[in-house]
Swiss-Prot record:
NCBIfam families noted in UniProt: eIF-6
Name of the gene encoding the protein in the UniProt record: EIF6
Source lineage: Eukaryota, Cryptophyceae, Pyrenomonadales, Geminigeraceae, Guillardia
Family: Belongs to the eIF-6 family.
GO CC field: cytoplasm; nucleolus
InterPro entries linked: eIF6 (IPR002769)
Protein's UniProt name: Eukaryotic translation initiation factor 6
Primary subcellular site in the record, as a coarse category: cytoplasm
Organism: Guillardia theta
Subunit and partners: Monomer. Associates with the 60S ribosomal subunit.
């Protein structure tokens, strides 16, 4: 079942959490209720790392990561980077992103195999992301939207994309990633699904305003089932 979260009174929980198959990063001052909800769902199988990034609580916006690697902005402090290095699994490769773009989480949607990138990212940045995360990167837009990470979220099971996408663009997503996609919303009608959903291949969290119909769609497309 998808779990609802309310972080800092906001429903855009993807701004504040990075969840992968091997680690979870949350801000230092996350309240104990939300921390315990996340910890309970992770069931001690995934380490939770509490840190800010660039002195900001928006760790989900500022980081890009999966179980193989983590990319941090060039504005990260020495102390913050050391916190990550001390608590991340040893196999996770950490590299600094040197372009003057800090909202990395808005520019890329990815799982363990593929990354969908905003055309605003340079080729050298895409190559860095590909090397660190071990994914194939493809540049595209979602209709007229360039902020791929804001309007798309997917894992190894399937994905949600903003609902105003053409059939051709939808079919391209399926062909590129090899997973099913569905147009949908989160938080009672918001199309920024990449900000309202946090997931890995086994768990899905969503913003607290997400209604039952939206949760049903998210569960069906993003959660593992015996039929997939």
């Amino acid at each position: 079942m998808t779990i609802k979260l309310n972080l800092y009174g906001k429903e855009d929980i993807g701004n504040y959490i990075l969840l992968t198959n091997s680690y979870c990063i949350v801000p230092h001052d996350i309240n104990s209720k939300n921390y315990n909800i996340i910890k309970s769902e992770l069931d001690n199988k995934i380490n939770i790392i509490c840190t800010n990034v660039s002195e900001s609580i928006c760790v989900g916006n500022l980081l890009i990561g999966n179980s193989k690697g983590l990319i941090v902005p060039n504005t990260i402090t020495f102390h913050e980077q050391n916190e990550l290095l001390n608590f991340l699994p040893e196999k996770v490769l950490v590299k600094k992103f040197n372009e003057n773009l800090t909202n990395l989480g808005n520019l890329l949607a990815h799982n363990e195999l593929y990354g969908l990138s905003s055309p605003d990212l340079s080729q050298s940045s895409c190559e860095l992301i590909s090397d660190v995360l071990g994914v194939e990167i493809l540049k595209l837009t979602l209709g007229e939207e360039k902020m791929i990470g804001t309007y798309c979220k997917f894992n190894i099971n399937g994905g949600i994309v903003q609902p105003f996408l053409s059939i051709e663009d939808h079919d391209e997503l399926v062909e590129i990633t090899g997973v099913p996609f569905i147009g949908g919303t989160v938080n009672s009608g918001c199309s920024n699904v990449g900000k309202g959903i946090v997931c890995n291949d086994n768990l899905v969290f969503c913003g607290y305003k997400t209604n039952q119909t939206e949760m049903h769609i998210i569960n069906n497309i993003m959660k593992k089932s015996k039929n997939k």
